[in-house]
């Protein structure tokens, strides 16, 4: 049935039947694909369809990632929660700061290893089923951390958590390519990723509240934190299974006209949900394309600041003169500001079709925030707190345009899924592993200069690399236009 449905809505097949056949040339491979030469799509009809999709997809996807990020990063809150009374994670599990860092690193090791297989399974099992499985699993595992009493248990559970959380973010970015055109993705990735900044803000507030539950029913507050924040993921998995739409071809809340419109819109720039591609052929071309490795290297540069802020913001604020539960509460403003900036930058990047330069500008702002934090005196608490807010805003705002830029410059369904997973697995995971080492516990009184210097340097690298890759794409496009005599029917690189 699925196959017949796919054939019915296959653009090439319908083009041949109607006799309205044109071709679109792939600037990368030189291959040509048939398409239907139909009337231009009405802007009003497209807006109505996009809004209908948005209501079903974006809030639910953002909520899923909110819970994922909450369960991933709460170990940073647990580390210092009620430390003054000896009821924190490190004390009760007899872990050193080095042990804690290893436990963080193990998570990202699993994260890097399982992202590509997870994206393959997302396509095979359908998004709603696979994401629901991931969600229930990571929620249960996060709750299991509440029962940890030693270093070995914490490390093993964090590895398992990394396995099941690995597939979510690259999966969601891949998932959006089934529904949205390239110029529509960055802002939607931003709304999803921005839920991580909300999770960071709410995580601090929740930890502050849960801290007052210390020893309730004989259970330490950090254990309550894992239970309270893991349970919603398990419960929500059932909701996701039934309400997350898979593909435009399969949903029943689109009319026949809307479904046809959705498929027409994505004929060139979208992934095909029921399309059976030559996966190995696409995979080989993806693996050997050097410009994609440039994207992965850039993503490595942004991943270290992202992970270090995610895991060490409570520790950083604790080193800024805020003690105990107040340190948890002071993690809220940096994430709140980052949320707003992230949305605005991504909206502008999509509106101007200039993702590379927006990422470069955001990275520069973040680098300046970290640089100022590194050179200011350790006792300049208020100024360094302001710099932390600037650094977080710049670092987080850089990511959605980068991911939108990558996905808009890949031209087959299999390649999109693989490249996104490789970007976050080969680029993101090593960067995030590096991020767990740079904020050294013995530098707390000095203001963590090593962490700030490393993040500043990496963000300056990201800015320069984005500009260089943007110039390369411009050169390639001008060359293609000269060789073809015009841009009609030729697929060019996006900026």
UniProtKB/Swiss-Prot annotation:
Keyword check for Ribosomal protein: no
Region Disordered, residue ranges: 1-24
Gene Ontology CC annotations of this record: plasma membrane
Pfam families: MFS_1
InterPro entries xref list: MFS, MFS_dom, MFS_trans_sf
Composition skew (Basic and acidic residues), residue ranges: 7-20
SUPFAM superfamilies: MFS general substrate transporter (SSF103473)
Keywords (A to Z) from UniProt: Cell membrane, Membrane, Transmembrane, Transmembrane helix, Transport
Single GO molecular function: transmembrane transporter activity
Location of the protein in the cell: Cell membrane
Claim: Transmembrane helix is one of the keywords in the record: yes
Record field: transmembrane: 102-122, 130-150, 159-179, 189-209, 224-244, 292-312, 329-349, 356-376, 386-406, 418-438, 449-469
Record's bilayer topology term: Multi-pass membrane protein
Function: Efflux pump that might be required for efficient secretion of pyrrolocin or other secondary metabolies produced by the pyrrolocin gene cluster.
Family, per entry: Belongs to the major facilitator superfamily.
The protein's name: MFS transporter prlL
Species this protein is from: Fungal sp. (strain NRRL 50135)
């Amino acid at each position: 049935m699925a196959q017949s449905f796919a054939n019915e809505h296959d653009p090439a097949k319908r083009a041949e039947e109607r006799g309205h056949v044109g071709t679109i040339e792939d600037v990368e491979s030189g291959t040509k694909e048939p398409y239907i030469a139909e009337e231009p799509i009405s802007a009003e009809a497209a807006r109505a369809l996009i809004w209908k999709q948005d209501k079903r997809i974006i809030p639910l996807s953002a909520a899923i990632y909110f819970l994922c990020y909450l369960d991933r990063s709460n170990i940073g809150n647990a580390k210092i929660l009620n430390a003054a009374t000896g009821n924190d994670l490190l004390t009760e599990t007899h872990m050193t700061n080095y042990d804690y860092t290893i436990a963080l690193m193990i998570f990202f090791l699993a994260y890097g290893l399982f992202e590509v297989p997870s994206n393959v399974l997302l396509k095979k099992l359908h998004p709603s089923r696979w994401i629901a499985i991931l969600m229930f699993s990571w929620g249960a595992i996060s709750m299991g951390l509440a029962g940890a009493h030693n270093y070995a248990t914490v490390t093993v559970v964090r590895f398992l958590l990394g396995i099941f959380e690995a597939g979510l973010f690259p999966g969601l970015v891949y998932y959006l390519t089934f529904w949205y055109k390239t110029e529509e993705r960055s802002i939607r990735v931003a709304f999803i990723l921005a839920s991580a900044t909300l999770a960071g803000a709410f995580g601090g507030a929740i930890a502050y509240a849960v801290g007052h539950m210390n020893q309730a029913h004989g259970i330490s507050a950090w254990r309550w934190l894992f239970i309270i924040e893991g349970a919603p993921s398990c419960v929500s998995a059932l909701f996701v299974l039934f309400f997350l739409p898979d593909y435009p071809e399969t949903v029943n809340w689109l009319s026949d006209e809307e479904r046809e419109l959705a498929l027409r819109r994505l004929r060139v720039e979208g992934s095909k949900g029921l399309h059976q591609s030559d996966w190995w052929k696409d995979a080989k071309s993806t693996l050997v394309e050097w410009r994609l490795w440039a994207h992965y290297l850039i993503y490595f540069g942004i991943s270290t600041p992202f992970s270090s802020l995610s895991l060490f913001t409570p520790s950083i604020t604790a080193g800024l003169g805020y003690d105990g539960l107040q340190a948890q509460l002071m993690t809220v403003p940096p994430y709140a500001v980052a949320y707003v900036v992230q949305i605005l930058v991504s909206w502008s990047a999509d509106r101007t079709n200039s993702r590379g330069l927006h990422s470069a500008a955001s990275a520069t702002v973040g680098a300046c925030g970290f640089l100022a934090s590194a050179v200011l005196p350790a006792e300049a608490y208020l100024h360094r707190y302001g710099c932390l807010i600037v650094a977080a805003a710049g670092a987080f705002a850089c990511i959605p345009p980068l991911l939108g830029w990558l996905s808009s410059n890949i031209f087959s369904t299999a390649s999109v899924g693989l490249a996104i997973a490789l970007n976050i697995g080969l680029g993101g995971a090593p960067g995030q592993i590096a991020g767990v080492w740079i904020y050294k516990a013995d530098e707390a009184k000095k203001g963590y200069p090593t962490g700030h210097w490393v993040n500043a340097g990496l963000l300056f690298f990201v800015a320069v690399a984005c500009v260089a890759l943007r110039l390369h794409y411009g050169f390639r496009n001008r060359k293609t236009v000269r060789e073809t005599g015009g841009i009609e029917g030729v697929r060019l690189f996006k900026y």
